[in-house]
């Protein structure tokens, strides 16, 4: 096996592992970005905890062939394609949306977002996906809503006791003054 072939096999294996591991996959068309813009975008993804890589479409398709359930993505591996892998559905969308707003280029454009088995290839999908709350935010909201009745109960129980304590204190103060 030649070194070139071995390197390709390694890349296919790596992409396949990521496609299998991550529930969130974004494919973008990065055509028209300068090297500086591409590096800036990579840095933003890295800061957000999103893996982002450019790979040959042929190698990505070969990796897809080894994975069940994600073969519908194959048609989107045409033209310049970059892949963003994430655990959070909103992070890649927010990075892309912020980049698009700041750079005003119209690139990179979203080809498709694969969110735990559902595909979003509509151009407006990016706005919707960017508004999604992260898993941690949703868990925090649920916990907050579960704790709210208990906090209200504690406040309700403390209220009369505090009023009674205040009344007794004012009576004691009046007796001292007399």
From Swiss-Prot:
Keywords per UniProt? Ribonucleoprotein, Ribosomal protein, RNA-binding, rRNA-binding
An example Gene Ontology CC term for this record = large ribosomal subunit
Gene3D superfamilies per UniProt: 3.30.70.1730, 6.10.250.290
Its BP terms in the Gene Ontology are: translation
Q: Which GO terms describe its molecular function?
A: large ribosomal subunit rRNA binding; structural constituent of ribosome
Task: List, alphabetically, the SUPFAM superfamilies matched.
Answer: Ribosomal protein L10-like
Q: Which Pfam families match?
A: Ribosomal_L10 (PF00466)
**Does the keyword field hold Ribosomal protein?**
yes
Keyword Ribonucleoprotein in record: yes
Assembly and partners?
Part of the ribosomal stalk of the 50S ribosomal subunit. The N-terminus interacts with L11 and the large rRNA to form the base of the stalk. The C-terminus forms an elongated spine to which L12 dimers bind in a sequential fashion forming a multimeric L10(L12)X complex.
User: What role does this protein play?
Assistant: Forms part of the ribosomal stalk, playing a central role in the interaction of the ribosome with GTP-bound translation factors.
Q: Which HAMAP family match?
A: Ribosomal_uL10
Show the PANTHER family listed in the entry: 39S RIBOSOMAL PROTEIN L10, MITOCHONDRIAL
Identify its protein family: Belongs to the universal ribosomal protein uL10 family.
Tell me what this protein is called: Large ribosomal subunit protein uL10
Q: Which gene encodes it?
A: rplJ
